[in-house]
Design a protein with these regions (language model features):
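N-terminal FAD cofactor-binding segment of flavoenzymes
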Residues: 26, 30, 43-90
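Carbohydrate-recognition beta-sandwich/jelly-roll modules
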Residues: 18, 42-43
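Conserved N-terminal helical subregion
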Residues: 81, 86-122
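N-terminal Rossmann-like FAD-binding beta1-loop-alpha1 element of flavoenzymes
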Residues: 2-36
Length: 122
């Protein structure tokens, strides 16, 4: 919001997870004054080295290419690419659909330097 003199108030984002960090980065690149707040001391602190799959099959664009377009450096964090997905059906049958491109990536979450949380924070 702008006051009567045209100055804008800072934008406060609650949560330093991936969505909060992405929103803050995009707003800051647009010239906004952004403050990110989180209940924990650091981005990714709730995960402590957990792994997360980031799916990549539901859109035509590659998610890491989108990150690059948004101004993130995907080389800042480790990711392992997979083209096969193991699907376990209710009857315990396992199928393995394959993709010609990257179906998903496993990333590490947390406070270590190589995690996606810290890469996006930088």
């Amino acid at each position: 919001m702008a006051d009567s003199a045209g100055a804008t108030e800072p934008i406060h984002i609650m949560g330093a997870g991936l969505s909060g960090l992405a929103a803050a980065t995009i707003l800051a690149k647009a010239g906004k004054d952004v403050h990110v707040h989180d209940v924990r001391a650091d981005s990714g602190a709730r995960f402590d080295g957990d792994f997360q799959a980031l799916e990549n099959w539901s859109m035509d664009a590659d998610f890491f290419q989108q990150l690059e377009q948004w101004g993130f450096d995907a080389s800042q964090f480790r990711a392992t690419e997979f083209q096969v997905v193991d699907l376990i059906h209710p009857d315990d049958v396992i199928t393995q659909p394959k993709s010609d491109r990257i179906a998903y990536r496993i990333v590490e979450r947390g406070t270590a330097e190589h995690t996606i949380d810290q890469g996006m924070k930088r």
